[in-house]
Amino acid sequence: MFDTHTVEIEWAGRPLKLETGKIARQADGAVLATYGETVVLATVVSAKAPKPGQDFFPLTVNYQEKTYAAGKIPGGYFKREGRPSEKETLVSRLIDRPIRPLFPEGYKNDTQVVVTVVQHDLENDPDVLSMVAASAALTLSGVPFMGPVGGARVGYINGEYVLNPHLDEMDESSLDLVVAGTYDAVLMVESEAKELNEEVMLGAVMFGHKGFQPVLDAIIKLAEVAAKEPRDFQPEDYSELEAEMLKHFEAELREGYKITQKADRYAAVDAVKAKVKAHFFPEGVEPKYTAEVIGAVFKHLQAKIVRWNILDTKSRIDGRDLSTVRPIVSEVGLLPRTHGSALFTRGETQAIVVATLGTGEDEQYVDSLTGMYKERFLLHYNFPPYSVGETGRMGSPGRREIGHGKLAWRAIRPMLPTAEQFPYTLRVVSEITESNGSSSMATVCGTSLALMDAGVPLAKPVAGIAMGLILEGDRFAVLSDILGDEDHLGDMDFKVAGTADGITSLQMDIKIAGITEEIMKVALGQAQGGRAHILGEMAKAITESRGQLGEFAPRIEVMNIPVDKIREVIGSGGKVIREIVEKTGAKINIEDDGTVKIASSSGKEIEAARKWIHSIVAEPEIGQIYEGTVVKTADFGAFVNFFGARDGLVHISQLASERVAKTQDVVKEGDKVWVKLLGFDERGKVRLSMKVVDQATGQEIPNEKKKEEAAE
């Protein structure tokens, strides 16, 4: 019934198995991939023909984690998986980025790649395996795909590169880098690092590229026995149309791209585009080409002209040379009632970034396949349509916004203080108010400024820069701080963030083969210079974290209590802790290890809560005098609440120095009294005395003390 084919290899000390022919046989391509004991199913379906009028390649990648893969049941009322998590969105992008450039230009058939995690061994992260499985499924599908693509994770532990480290090894690693590519080219890099230099980062990229070569061999081996017949796809040849367009409009287009101001340049290019349409769509004549074809070729021509100009003149669209960064203005304290704020403007790219400090209650609970964990640093990136002068949808963040936010998050996180050093939850929101390239790197810079303005003790300021690279034959140009117009015409786009001493995040997207290690080294060196320049400009606003928190930020005091006292502080059904919160106004968070965080914008509220908790967990000392409240009277004495929630008995003989006939003759419920702790009886009950204490002053009465000692 099944025509199953399997290839197995040993990869980084663990077995990798690729299997096809048994599951999801109606898909164009399907591969069940196993690494260690983590299993993913990747499927590919591509429409047989493009939709009429389709003018782009509609590729969709969906990565999904099923909770059953880790032996769990989803939370929530419906008990089933809901909308994609942040990780699912990020891994979908991770798979998409290296495979998209390998589809031939002109292929516009609706294509969907679905990767499902069906088993997780809690040792091997499914993201790299998913990339491999998707590549294998595409290679088998018969869809025009110039792969295969391989992928690998690289760690850096004790000065050594590690291929595909286990999840628990990543805690020791100063690098988390994922690299993908073909036999002869690196196509994608995504990373987070702890201030590593350019040489180490580039070495990791090349180490990973070498490390996934056996995976490419395995995919080819599987394709030799299981691949479907390649679909017949011949891209249209529009070289004749391009030549005619060049002949008539090259000069005008070149003039348009000499205009350095974005809006004026767009207007000039649109005017040329209108002339192109008039030329190729004369009235009363049947057009030779469709509007979609004319638009696509014109766009291609725009890219060519800009690339030629840059390579020939070493001058950019906006008049800059290759390495100059646009003018930068950094401001902090823009919104004084927020906890920390910054406005970062670089050319026509601008971000308002606001930092908010919260308590442990504000931490984000993340339910992943590897278990529930809490995240104390949140960074949210928003890209409203007005930032590029357009109208558009407003609502929940899209994949791009989530991806850009995570890139900035990775860049900043290595410089954050530990929870012990700074027990706050941090949320940063970046509102992109203008965009003309590199808004994610503006977010990095603005986040660094806003956190320092908020008084967060960042180890060092962090800056980011977006770079481009153009390669034609043996000529190449590296562009620093690229514009939006330059973003798509380059052969390599990469973003580097870090401090003055090293890289904290590197993201690369390489679209062609031929970009050598030496070229990447030159590009990273130029990026280092740009990053240093931006850090210098940021320093004009603020150089280090403020010595104190903002006026409106909460204060947090940390204290530790014995674990066996946690129940007493919380109380039955949370009664005690609720009372402390209500009476003092402070927020209280208690960890399982006995760490107590007390938060409030008022120092008095924090101190009141601290004293209350201390009175609950501390043990009263024999011989000490305490203030208390009579909570109950009886024939044999009075019960007094003292030392927090603790009660003790003042026997009728200890109420006063003279003989007392009735307890109520001396005290009533609600009376404030001074008591001395005499000790504990054989059952552990507290024995108190009032008669040895002056009820007016709270001081011990010397004569009564002597009598007491004589009696003992």
Swiss-Prot record:
Main location: cytoplasm
PROSITE patterns: KH_TYPE_1 (PS50084), S1 (PS50126)
GO-annotated molecular function: 3'-5'-RNA exonuclease activity; magnesium ion binding; polyribonucleotide nucleotidyltransferase activity; RNA binding
InterPro entries, A to Z: ExoRNase_PH_dom1, ExoRNase_PH_dom2, ExoRNase_PH_dom2_sf, KH_dom, KH_dom_type_1, KH_dom_type_1_sf, NA-bd_OB-fold, PNPase
Catalytic activities: RNA(n+1) + phosphate = RNA(n) + a ribonucleoside 5'-diphosphate
Cofactors named for this entry: Mg(2+)
Coiled-coil stretches noted in the UniProt entry, renumbered to this chain: none
GO biological process, any: RNA processing
Residue ranges occupied by any S1 motif domain in the UniProt entry: 623-691
UniProt subcellular location: Cytoplasm
Gene3D superfamilies: GHMP Kinase, N-terminal domain, K Homology domain, type 1, Nucleic acid-binding proteins
Purpose of the protein: Involved in mRNA degradation. Catalyzes the phosphorolysis of single-stranded polyribonucleotides processively in the 3'- to 5'-direction.
Family: Belongs to the polyribonucleotide nucleotidyltransferase family.
HAMAP family noted in UniProt: PNPase (MF_01595)
UniProt protein name: Polyribonucleotide nucleotidyltransferase
